Each structure stands twice: as structure tokens, then as C-alpha cells.
Amino acid sequence: MSLILSNVILHKLVKNEQDELEVCLRNQLLENEEFTEALVSELHRVFNSKAGKGFGIFKTESEFGHWLGSVRKNETPFLEFSNKSAEKLKSELIKYPFAEEGILVIAEYQSLATEYLFVAVLPSNESMKVTDELNISATDYLDIAKMDIAARIDLSTWETDSDSNRYLTFIKGRVGRKVSDFFLDFLQADVGMDTKVQNQVLMQAVEDFCADERLEKEEKQQYRKQVYDYCNGQLQAGEELTVKELSGELPTSESGSNFYQFAEEQGYELEESFPVDRTALRKLTKFVGAGGGLSLNFDAMLLGERVFYDPETDTLTIKGTPPNLKDQLTRRLGSSES
């Protein structure tokens, strides 16, 4: 991956003897050399591969946004911007119970004609290494794969499209809303495009289109499968789905309208493109549910053929039990009768 580096800096978040978080500031930018480019390239790659990212936009009063704008206009040196950002990050981080030590990296770079600003707190872990004398000693390393406090601003979009609701991307993190809340507070940003909602609206639009066109059951299943195949292909490739491109993959109705026109006319307010949500996608081809000690998962095409649901009695009937399940049930019933 070829990147063009503009500015890269590292600062360190450490805890003092009183277990209070402090910032150790680096006094100059990193040199634009091989290791610096390798670091930023890996950060860019890992960030792209992270699932569950959220989108945001700067609030009007965002200090971080104003500082960044000043840097982009060459009114403020990048080093000064990074120092102020590091201090602000610390002041926000100490409000949360997950405040930990780490390496703050702030990088301004270009990839594929798009300019970015990347901000992340990287875990610094200890490991072992073998020296040239074949002795064992301790060494520290950056655990980039485990980063969950990170955000990236698409500078090109931010500066050219004031109506964009997704130029800021952040990792939501595995510890729930707290990490994303903290980073949004630090950046003084609001949540922008909701990927999950966009996917849910898309799936509902697909169902409504099938109903509006009065497709037969088999036609509906085929239509859903084509939607699934396209979206899953984009997901596997790490690409976003494009509504117009998806529509082009689907057959035009007998009335001559296509899915894209339908979605536009019915006012679903879908973005032109957005990331695929795996959970929403799965519901196109499967019914999944769990609760009360019961877990069910079956292909949607089986509903009405081998699986029947009666809403009045809230009863699900399955005809043709899977062989391995049938064997378990038979053995259990047999042992209870003996």
C-alpha cells in the first residue's frame, strides 16, 4: 500500500506513582522514513478491516475541529496541534474507568487520492526477544491489532462536502458504548450516519418492493438471494454496498421500474452507499432467534414448507427433524422410559 505521509507524531500516556494519567509529549515530528510509513500503513489497513465502526461529524463548537482546520490552513504547526490534542485527550480519558496507558499516534497522510487524519491510542505490551548473544530480554511492542480507541477523519470529504454525515469514522469498541462516547467527547462530535439503521431500512425496502410487485414466493426468495449475494460479496471484499449498483444486479419489474427508483420514490432516505451489516444481511436468508433456553436457526425458504408458525397459538411446528437432533431426542426419550 502506497501512502504519502504529511505529518506523524507519537505521544505517550503513562500513569505516575499516584496512578494518575499523564502525557509525555514528543518534541518533534517523526521522520518520513520506512518505519514511519510501515506504521501508518498498518494502522490504515487494520482500521479498514475493523468491524462495527461508527460515523460522526464535528459539532460546531468542536475545539478539535477548529484546531484541525487551523492546521489545514497552515495557521498552526502540526506539533502544536498534536500537543493540544494530547492534553485534551488525557482530560477526557481520565473521566472513564478504562483509562489506561498507551501510545497516542496522530498521522496526517494521503491514500488513493484521499487525505486523512488518523488518531488512535495504541496498546503497548511487553514481550520477550532473543538477543544476538542468544540471551532472553524484555521488549515492548505496539499491539495494533487490538486497538479499539481510534478515529479517522476523511479530510478530503470534510473540506469539500459540508453536508456529509460520515467524514469521521470511529471504532465503537468491544466494551460497548463507553469507548465510542469517550472518543466522540474528545473530538466533540455527534453521531452521523447509522450503518445499522441504513441496513435495516434497506432490508425493509427490499421486502416492500417484493410486496409491491406482487412477486410469487419463489420469486421473492430468488430476489432476496440476489440481494444477499451482492451484499455478501461487498462484505467479503471489504467494500461498501452502493444502492444503485445493487439495483443494477436485480431484475427490472414487469412495470419497468427498478429497485433504485422504488427506493427513491417511496422516500426511504437511503444513503448512496454504506457498509454492510452482517446481522441485518443474515436476516434475508435465515430466521434466527434465541431465548428461554431455546435457540433456533433455519433457512427462510423453509417457512411454510417444513416450518410452520401459528401466531394465534404462538406455536412453531417443524416437519422433518434434523437427523442428529432426532437421534439425540430418541436416545433421551428411550433412556427416560427404561
Swiss-Prot record:
It is found in: Cytoplasm, Nucleoid. Pfam families: NA37. InterPro entries: Nucleoid_associated_NdpA. Residues 319-338 are annotated as: Disordered. One of its GO terms (cellular component) is bacterial nucleoid. Keywords: Cytoplasm. It comes from the Bacteria. The keyword Nucleotide-binding does not apply. One of its GO terms (molecular function) is double-stranded DNA binding. Belongs to the YejK family. This is Nucleoid-associated protein VSAL_I1059. It comes from Aliivibrio salmonicida (strain LFI1238). The lineage of its organism: Bacteria, Pseudomonadati, Pseudomonadota, Gammaproteobacteria, Vibrionales.
